[in-house]
């Protein structure tokens, strides 16, 4: 039976893609087949490719087309709903859900759905990316960017996930830059206050590698 996880972040730039790739590397090391989808990405090169989506493709074991991994690729590196408006496109949660289900029907048995920005990123005036996770009814893995303000951001996000009726399955402490002051104290507070197990504390890796990052994660209960 396949397992699907929605990877959310406490903010933009906290390392959702890096951790998504590390999760897949850890899962594939146990023999699982992995796949990922980033249904909406804002910020593409001249060929219409998004760097995060390309990283996901490199990390997964399944051979999926780019259009499956990143079906909505928006040129401008700004909030998705604004980028969509500039591109003359309309984003709808129901359509994004259908695109995600397409990947969920693949041969992979460990699937990652990566969000964009934080939990409440709008996709239109009425819906956010959280609505995609809610309609899919999948567990959420929260990436906490270990920097000043992370405790407040993490607790607010966990509360929002709970109020949306979803399970915060686990969280990952990720260092997107040099180690923050009082790192261990912040980490211990998060351990005590977040209502989910911590999968690991991933250090800042200047020469980032998914396999190396995976060594800092314990994903056994996600893959059982």
Over which residues does each language-model region extend?
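C-terminal lobe/tail of nucleotide-utilizing enzymes
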Residues: 158-224
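Inter-motif core of Ras-like GTPase G domains
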Residues: 124-147
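N-terminal phosphate/diphosphate-binding loop that engages ATP/GTP or pyrophosphate donors
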Residues: 18-90, 94, 99-103
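Extreme N-terminal starter segment of soluble prokaryotic enzymes
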Residues: 1-6, 32-33
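Switch II (G3) loop of P-loop NTPases
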Residues: 96-125
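Short internal beta-strands
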Residues: 38, 141-144, 169-174
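Structural motif
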Residues: 6, 110-114, 141, 172
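Glycine-rich phosphate-binding P-loop
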Residues: 6-23
């Amino acid at each position: 039976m396949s397992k699907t996880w929605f990877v959310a972040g406490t903010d933009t730039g906290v390392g959702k893609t890096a951790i998504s790739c590390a999760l897949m590397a850890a899962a594939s090391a146990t023999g699982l087949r992995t796949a990922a989808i980033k249904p909406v990405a804002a910020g593409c090169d001249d060929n219409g490719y998004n760097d995060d989506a390309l990283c996901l493709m490199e990390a997964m074991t399944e051979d999926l087309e780019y259009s499956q991994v990143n079906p909505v690729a928006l040129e401008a590196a700004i909030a998705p709903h604004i980028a969509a408006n500039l591109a003359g496109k309309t984003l709808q949660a129901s359509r994004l859900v259908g695109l995600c289900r397409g990947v969920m029907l693949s041969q992979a048995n460990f699937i990652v759905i990566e969000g964009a920005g934080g939990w409440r990123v709008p996709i239109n005036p009425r819906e956010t990316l959280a609505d995609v996770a809610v309609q899919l009814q999948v567990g959420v893995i929260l990436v906490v960017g270990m920097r000043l303000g992370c405790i407040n951001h993490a607790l607010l996000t966990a509360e929002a996930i709970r109020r949306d009726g979803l399970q915060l399955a686990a969280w990952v402490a990720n260092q997107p830059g040099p180690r923050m002051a009082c790192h261990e104290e912040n980490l211990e507070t998060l351990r005590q206050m977040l209502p989910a197990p911590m999968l690991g504390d991933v250090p800042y890796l200047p020469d980032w590698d998914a396999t190396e990052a995976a060594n800092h994660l314990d994903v056994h209960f996600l893959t059982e």
